[in-house]
Amino acid sequence: SINTPDGAIVYMGDYVIDSTMKGAYDMDLGKLAYIGKQGVLLLMQESVFSEKTGFTSPNHKLDKYFKNAVEKSEGRLIFSILPLHLLTIQNIFDAVKGTDRKVVVMGKYLQTIIEMAIREGYLDVPNGMIGDLKDLKEKNTVILVSNDREAPYYNLSRIVNGYDKYVSLEVNDSICFADPSYEAQELTSVKIKNEIAIHGINIFDVPKNKNVRLHASSQDLMLMVKIFNPKYYMPIKGEYRYQVANAKLASLVGIPNENIFLKENGDVVYIEDGTFVDKGEHIKVDDILIDGKSSSDVGELVLKDREMLGNNGLILISATVDKKTKQIINGPEVLSRGFIFAKDNLDVIEEIKKKSLEIIKNN
């Protein structure tokens, strides 16, 4: 929260209310109530689960499913996880406690997040539990593989299809999907699970009726409104219809409709001397050009890469290969941009195709 002379401005991130949590995940409702008693000018809450009835807890708890996977897997156990779901990661480490299994974290990004979370006290991991690459061959190793919402199951797919240089699937391996697939990922989820089944690998999956995303449901949201008792309320985050549902919840627990703001990206909210002033101001919000995984300004290195492409050109080689028989169905085709004119250099293009064909056949 941010304190102002007119009261606190409170921004609630993703959360669930769970009185059984301890340590870094313990929500101190007493402190929140204290902020409310001091006076809250504006409360902003997420809207993603505003249409869901009841509290999110205890549906977000996955420890028993992970414990079952650890106990029943005969060989190595691979978890596909979202890197920023620290509670899910903690549940996995808790499930491994008391066993002789080592946990190997794959990928620098996931390693960095887990190391930082341990250092800051957000993850409680016993000394010696985290192993390294030499433990990958051990039959009882637990392997954490990061899943990316923008490229779902990419890292796991590399392992399943034999492209990962560190991990190759073995007969007794098992794979556990620790996070739910989002609506836009359903087809990708079905595809990767079919590929796993073809390899004869056991799959542990969280039941679909488990609500494991850490978002506040309707009762969570209404309880927070009662605790903070804000003068103004603004739903944020989530589709517009979810924000409308969030606004209705606030109205149900006593916030006047005229004190509830439903705003779109770019709308400016002015509160002067403790009172909302509708100036109708709007900041132009444009789409952001995303380069790779970065949504920040395009850096010098990226610009240099583009300059190099502009100066030297690009050759793209494509071929269609049957993933079962490894036979070439079509191609290879050669696409040249800014390098040579294909129609004037047919001999060069044919030589590139020939070399490409050799490389594909030998790999």
What are the roles of these predicted feature ranges?
Residues 1-135, 155-165, 187-190:
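His/Asp/Glu-rich metal-coordinating catalytic cores
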Residues 165, 169, 180-200, 347:
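Redox- and metal-dependent alpha/beta enzyme cores, enriched for Fe-S-associated oxidoreductases
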Residues 302-363:
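Conserved bacterial/organellar gene-expression machines centered on ribosome-associated P-loop NTPases
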Residues 234-275:
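Anionic-ligand-binding alpha/beta catalytic cores of soluble enzymes and soluble regulatory domains
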Residues 198-216, 220:
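Generic long, charged, amphipathic alpha-helical segments
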Residues 40-41, 75, 221-238, 246:
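Proline-aspartate-enriched helix->loop->beta-strand connector
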Residues 70-77, 97-101, 172-176, 201-205, ...:
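Short, surface-exposed connector motifs at secondary-structure boundaries
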Residues 106-179, 280-302:
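A contiguous, basic/glycine-rich beta-loop/short-helix subdomain that forms a polymer-engagement track
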